[in-house]
Amino acid sequence: MFEKPVVKTFQYGNHTVTLETGVMARQATAAVMATMDDTAVFVSVVGKKEAVVGQDFFPLTVNYQERTYAAGKIPGGFFKREGRPSEGETLIARLIDRPIRPLFPDGFTNEVQVIATVVSVNPDVQPDIISMIGTSAALAISGLPFNGPIGAARVGHIDGQLVLNPSEKELKQSRLDLVVAGTDNAVLMVESEAQILTEEEMLAAVVFGHDQQQAVIKAINEFAAEVATPAWEWVAPAENTELKAKVAALAETRLVEAYQITEKMARYDRIHAISSEVTAALLAENEALDTKEIHTIFHDLEKTVVRRSIIAGNPRIDGREKDMVRALDVRTGVLPRTHGSALFTRGETQALVTATLGTQRDAQIIDELTGEKKDHFLLHYNFPPYCVGETGFVGSPKRREIGHGRLAKRGIAAVMPSPEEFPYTVRVVSEITESNGSSSMASVCGSSLALMDAGVPIKASVAGIAMGLVKEENDFVVLSDILGDEDHLGDMDFKVAGTATGVTALQMDIKIEGITKEIMQIALNQAKGARLHILSVMDQAISAARSDISEFAPRIHTMKISVEKIKDVIGKGGAVIRQLTEETGTTIEIEDDGTIKIAATDGDQAKEAIRRIQEITAEVEVGVIYTGKVARLADFGAFVTILPGKDGLVHISQIADKRVEKVSDYLTEGQEVQVKVLEIDRQGRVRLSMKEAVETSDAAAEVAPQAAPQAE
């Protein structure tokens, strides 16, 4: 039934990788089962043979989906099946997309869809790297005009050594989590998070990862040669040189002048006017011309004008030199009721960032294939349409917003205090209110400021900067703090976040080949200078966390009780703790080791909760006098509550110093009495005496102190 499948197995660091095709999804353009030590991802590629007429963009879609059966689980929820992509799935889809997109040729507009499905997972092997390898292999055997294959590698930094594809366990000890992808001679994509490493260490990790992944590229080339799929008969559309010359004659000089306008919206208005006038003039001359083709040629001319000016050493679009950072404006405490806030403005890019403190109960529970985990630091990025002067749909976050939020979070994570140092869940939200390039890095700066304003004891200020590159043959210019146009028209987007002493996050997307180690080194060094400048301005506004948190934030008080007492504080069916939280207006969390965290915005409420917990957990001591309440009467004596949940018996002979015939003659239920603890037997029963309490009091005996546990 099946033709003989093609299988390629090779060693990749400590892992064994297997690529297999020919058995499953034979109606797809290409399909590969990629396996790395029991983590298996099935990747399909489908390309449409015909492009949509008049389409001027490349419709590539990458879907990444994790099936819970891969980990031997059944999904939660009412429907018991997988739903919309999680944040993690969205991020890995972007990770696959970014290095493959620039390898399709200009002019190729056929629709292509990649679907990567995780079908088996080894908890120690993350599925992202093998998903990228599987995608590369599937594209390599698809026959599509794909200028690959690519390799992918994760790099860790453990005990001063670079480690290829570290396991989940090793990553916990690593100071670096870096993913690099590229072809045999070029790095195309880097995504990383670091514990404040130097620029040299980051670059060494990128080069190491690129060198190591050559084994993957070699194996995929051999795999593709064995499959031997015929290449598609696709020919790049012929260039309309006549129309190109006409557009240049009408627009080039005017575009050069338009790009002297430094204000973004005014420049856009002028360029739009030129485009409309050129299009109208050409259509008046020949009605048969394609408007979309005119616009594409006009856009390409814009790109040429800007790039030529930058390579020539002229001032940039907004008048800056190549290594200048735009004007900065930094403000903190801009919103009165938030726990922390900042407004960070860099040129025409602006972020309003807030920090909110919550309890451990507010932590996000993330249900991953490898297990459940809690995240106590959340960072969300919003990019509303008004920030670029447009109208648009407002709803759930798009892929780009999720990706930018994660990048900003990576930049800040290294300086966040541990839950033990700061027992709060922290949520940061960045609202982009203006955008003209590098809004994710503005979010990093604003987040650092808002956290300090909220009193979160971060280890250092963090700033981010976006770098760009324009390269023509052997000439290149590295640009600091790029504008949106420079990002769009350039060859590289290179974002670096870090403190004054090192890098915390690095993201790189390269659109061309030929980016050398020297160019990356120059970009990193130039980024460091820009970062230090931004940090100096930020430190003038706020250089350390405020000494106290906001009056509107919950204050968390920590106390410790005996593990045996946890059940007493919780009560039967949670009755005691529920009553405590309702009556004191606090939030109470109890950990397995007896640590209790009490959160309240009102200090008196917290004190009352602490007092009551101390009462509940206090131990009865022999020889100590307590003030208790008579709980019930019996013929042989009375039961008295001396501590919450702790009753003792006053025998009829211990009520008074004379003979008592009837208990009710001396006591009533609810009456407060002083009693002395005579004995606690082996079964924990407490024997009390009223008459000895009176005698001891007369002798100036010590009355029972409050229970001992102390709260911080």
From Swiss-Prot:
One of its GO terms (cellular component) is cytosol. Residues 554-613 form the KH domain. The keyword Cell membrane does not apply. Mg(2+) binds at D487, D493. NCBIfam families: polynuc_phos (TIGR03591), PRK11824.1 (NF008805). Belongs to the polyribonucleotide nucleotidyltransferase family. This is Polyribonucleotide nucleotidyltransferase. The lineage of its organism: Bacteria, Pseudomonadati, Pseudomonadota, Gammaproteobacteria, Vibrionales. The gene is pnp.
